[in-house]
């Protein structure tokens, strides 16, 4: 429902006041839609995240400086003037990256406090890439929390091969499908004393949260990535 209304209002505004921007409107939406689809099919975005980004592109294809300027005037980047949804997206990616830094710091502190290996048992044999992804997107939680919190997803699984300790593997792209089965296997392994109580999990934050934050910050302060680059380059 939101997309048709946004499209109608944007087209009406452009046709009435500035028809010359219609090609740029198509360009802005086309590039944003291409990025949204690519991220969706690669697993980086959920369906709701992709739709939200495309709806934003329909409603706010260009910078809103004509209505009100950001609190930081230099935050209006050349890209945001023509491709405002991409400025929102870049801000969202920046916030997502910041959450990864927080997760990494949290895991280092957890390791120091508990004095355990971060990757125990057969998890130590997993690839470096998988370990890095888990370190910046997940953290250790008791199995009981996995059972109680539906929005927390396991990032490791137990292969019931009869070994003691059993073989464990990292799950870098947790999904709703199979979640309860994985939690059941982890719980059983903990109850039988085959693995420690703390396992890898992720809060499963949708990218939509970061996109929303990116939208608000873009309206209030502008393109944060542009501001950072401008500051670094002097």
Regions found by a protein language model. Name each.
Residues 1-234:
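A membrane-topology feature that recognizes alpha-helical transmembrane segments
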